[in-house]
Amino acid sequence: MAVLASSNSHAAPRSLDRTRIKRLISSCGIEAWFVQDSTVPLISMEYAFTGGAAQDPAQRPGVAHMVSGLLKEGSGKFDFKTFHQRLDRHAIELRFHVTHDHFRGALRTINDSAEEAFELLRIALTSPRFEAADVERNRAAVLARLRHDSTDPSSLARRKFLEVAFGDHPYARPVDGYLESVPKIEAEDLKGYVRRVIAKRHVQNRGGRRGRSRGRLQAAR
C-alpha cells in the first residue's frame, strides 16, 4: 500500500530511501507489515481474509459480493445514515472488495481519527446489520449491473471463459453472481458468510496471516 505525499517533487525519493518495513505480531497472533512515514498525517491499512466468492453457496453465487457492498451500510448501533456521517465527519475511508479467493479491505484516514477509524472498521466487520432496506438497495444495484453485463460482449466472453476453463469448480461462477441467483440471496446467507470468513483465523496477505499498514502511526499502537 502507499501513503506518500510531499510538497517537494524531489523529496519523495529520499523518503523512500529511508523506508523500513517492520514486522509486527499482535497479541492475538496476527502478523502485520508496518511502514512508518512521518511526512504526512495519514494512516493506510490493507488486509485480506482467505475465503472469497468461492465460499458462496453453490445455488447462491453473489453472496460475498453483496457482503462487500453492505458492510458500510450500517453496523452495530449505527444505521446507514449515522455510519456514513461518522465516516465523513472524521475523514475515514473504508473499502471492501471480493475475489474468488479473498475478501479484501482497506482503511485510510488522518492520524487524529485513528481510534474512530479502527472502531468503525471493527464494528463493520463484526456487527453488520444487513437491514432489509439496505439489502434491497444493494441487491437492486447489483442486478442493474448484471443486466448491463448480460448485453456486454466482453462480460459475456469473460463468463463463458470461466465456465469452459473451470467447469464445476466454484471459480466458474462469477463473483457478482447471476441474474437468477442474486434475487434468492437472503440476510441469513450474508450473516453466514461473515461468520465463516470474517474471522481471525482467516486473516491473510500474500501467503501468510498478514496485514499491511503505513502512515504516521506508532508501531506500539
Annotate each PLM feature.
Residues 14-46:
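Mature N-terminal segment immediately following signal peptide/propeptide cleavage
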Residues 74-77, 125-133:
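Short, polar/flexible loop-turn hinges at active-site or ligand-entry regions and domain interfaces
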Residues 80, 132, 187, 213-214:
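Alpha-helix N-capping/helix-start residues
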Residues 194:
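Conserved, carboxylate-rich catalytic/transport cores that coordinate ions
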